């Protein structure tokens, strides 16, 4: 069960006006005063299906998959250590093998951040550092606290760093801008938190940096700089115009703008979390089951599909993403959707932590 401890202070709502359904300019975020939806959904689902609580827990298989993926990436890096970065062999391997592998590791770190790889928290933290190695840059230590806040404060402006900023909305409000965002999407997820909400530097960050840069040095020293370049290219492509990168958009972007307009202020709050049930889940620990994950964040990937099976009445009527490739294409080319298709919350009576949240799972 999650517990949080933090120093709090009341924070006023954002200065922006609430979204107006009658406004001629619909290119703005949808603001709502409602709480994030998954807490109440979880209570309702457990009331109807208490057996779902038994699905909570870690999955031992995860560590072996991570070991295999890390080994595969190191093998590819070694085999490409004498190849030109500009060769088709290098690029195609990075795109069709490396990007799938590193996206797998991104989502493995996501599972481990929820303590779903091992029974003990320390083992999950340590294995995050191992899974981080082929990514090239240290990110596992930073990901966890930001991601825990994303769950606890979904949609809260200034707290949920998954949300685009006003500057991003303005800069990427056309086809070229959205194409640029999708191409370099991983960089926005990496640097946006530094602008929106900086969290304290911890011992975990220190070890993440030491372990990662030591590994990078050893790779360059004994295998060659091209091997390290392969790791970085794999990570870049995984967060760029790649099929698995569609999950970044499918999770919380409401791609049917008319659904927002039809449920303006004073009406039903629009949907803000979506799932994808397609075959690419095979590569990413069923990360497409995103509504289910937010409803039950401590159910491991091998059992998350069971949530929907046990409580179909809570999921079958919610629109789902049919294609991760398709949603990237739609996001870029459709003038009716864009950075603004996100729900943001104004919590007038909520206390927001001024420091990092410390979440513990028992």
Curated annotation (Swiss-Prot):
Q: Spell out the residue ranges making up region: Disordered.
A: 1-20
| Record note on disruption phenotype | Results in the dramatic reduction in the endogenous levels of sphingosine.
Q: What GO annotations for molecular function exist for this entry?
A: sphingolipid delta-4 desaturase activity
What parts of the sequence cross the membrane? 60-80, 90-110, 121-143, 169-189, 200-220, 228-248
Q: What is its EC number?
A: 1.14.19.17
Where does the protein end up? Answer: Membrane
- One term under GO cellular component: endoplasmic reticulum
Entries under InterPro entries matching the protein: DES1/DES2, FA_desaturase_dom, Sphingolipid_d4-desaturase_N
UniProt pathway: Lipid metabolism; sphingolipid metabolism
Keyword Transmembrane helix attached? yes
Give membrane topology per the record. Answer: Multi-pass membrane protein
What is the protein's known function?
Delta(4)-fatty-acid desaturase which introduces a double bond at the 4-position in the long-chain base (LCB) of ceramides. Required for sphingosine biosynthesis.
Q: What is this protein called?
A: Sphingolipid delta(4)-desaturase
Please name the source species: Schizosaccharomyces pombe (strain 972 / ATCC 24843)
